């Protein structure tokens, strides 16, 4: 049975439901993720686009030739990335409950961009 994950932005204007399984849970420290979020590392989880339902349409900014970063138009909360291929990557910090074993990162992208003083 597929699990449903719920979350949303800081102000509550945008809520989402994503039907699992959660795919490719990972962390990333690339410059784009750092600038998008203001954090040194982001935790991502991917879902097929047709398995993600939004209560309101997030704002997007075209960040590359294959993806757009999504955020709340009212409070600016980072929500994730909407790829041209049918994938939506959501940031785990926007989930209502992130304390699930299946959401633990399986790998880290761009580990070389992580500050040396940052705990592993």
Q: Which residues make up each language-model segment?
A:
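A short Gly-Trp-Pro
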Residues: 1-8, 13-120
């Amino acid at each position: 049975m597929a699990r449903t994950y719920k979350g949303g932005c800081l102000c509550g204007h945008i809520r989402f439901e994503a039907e699992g399984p959660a795919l490719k849970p990972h962390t990333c420290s690339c410059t784009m993720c750092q600038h998008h979020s203001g954090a040194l590392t982001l935790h991502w989880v991917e879902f097929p686009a047709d398995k993600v339902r939004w209560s309101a349409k997030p704002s997007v900014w075209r960040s590359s030739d294959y993806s757009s970063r999504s955020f709340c138009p009212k409070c600016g909360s980072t929500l994730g990335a909407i790829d041209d291929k049918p994938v939506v990557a959501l940031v785990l910090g926007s989930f209502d409950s992130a304390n699930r074993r299946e959401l633990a990162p399986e790998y880290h992208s761009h580990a070389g961009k992580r500050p040396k003083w940052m705990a592993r």
